[in-house]
A protein has these predicted regions:
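Non-catalytic accessory segments adjacent to catalytic cores
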Residues: 2-103, 199-201
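Short beta-strand segments
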Residues: 15-16, 99, 130, 144, ...
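Short, surface-exposed charged micro-motifs
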Residues: 27, 32-34, 133, 140-144
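Active-site pocket-lining segments that scaffold enzyme catalytic pockets across diverse folds
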Residues: 59-141, 183-188, 192-195, 199, ...
């Protein structure tokens, strides 16, 4: 390994992704090429005996892309929400996480690099990822291990931003006081803490969440940390 910088993030980098389903395989990925930037300095890390790759190879295509969207209709979604609420009221369930898909089609190839670049620009405080066509940006951190310190960022409880700073500040305050969102958040934090506790000699679970501001929404967030045994 030849490393002339010796800074955080330089040299080979390993990324991991763990499935919520224990029967599914997890992933360990060492990228062939990493372009990094920190404190005004940029660098490139590549694996192999070949010469340094040309940066032009990684510049996203600037062609315009038109997408057509399709997905489930509002009535179906509202029905699912109503049935989930009834199950919670009856005590059958404590929490439900609903998801719906939207299909985007295009007559041109969709550049993953361009999509990643756009996500990184729009959501600078999130983790952006791409693997075998799975591309996204998430503010939630399942687990991070730094020496013996393990960290998990839990998000639960969300409100949409309006774009008006004064109005959004008031909405952030209402989110932080919402009994419904606080109960939902506590459930998620407890689930993570209970999973990490058997693996740690000590843990820190904050009593109250903070409000994480993204470009389009705000989340209740808690950073659960522990020292591995």
């Amino acid at each position: 390994i030849h490393n002339n910088l010796h800074g955080t993030g330089t040299g080979p980098v390993l990324f991991t992704s763990f499935s919520f389903d224990p029967s599914e395989d997890s992933l360990l990925i060492i990228p062939r090429v990493v372009i990094g930037q920190r404190n005004g300095k940029s660098w490139i890390t590549w694996i192999g005996a070949t010469p340094q790759p040309a940066l032009q190879e990684f510049i996203p295509n600037a062609d315009e892309l038109t997408l057509a969207w399709s997905g489930s209709n509002g009535d179906v979604w509202q029905d699912r929400v109503a049935r989930s609420v009834e199950k919670i009221k009856s005590g059958e369930l404590e929490k439900v996480v609903l998801a719906r898909f939207v299909t985007a089609t295009s007559d041109k190839a969709i550049s993953e690099r361009r999509l990643l670049s756009h996500l990184a620009d729009e959501y600078p405080s999130t983790w952006v990822y791409s693997h075998h066509g799975l591309v996204g940006a998430t503010p939630e951190l399942l687990v991070r291990l730094n020496r013996s310190l393990v960290t998990s960022r839990v998000l639960a409880g969300t409100i949409r931003k309006t774009g008006d700073d004064e109005r959004d500040l008031a909405l952030a305050g209402s989110l932080a006081r919402s009994s419904k969102d606080l109960e939902e958040h506590e459930y998620a934090v407890r689930s993570v803490a209970d999973s990490l506790s058997p693996l740690c000699s000590s843990m820190n679970v904050p009593e109250s969440p903070f409000v994480l501001h993204l470009s389009n929404v705000m989340h209740l967030a808690t950073d659960v940390t522990g020292v591995l045994t």
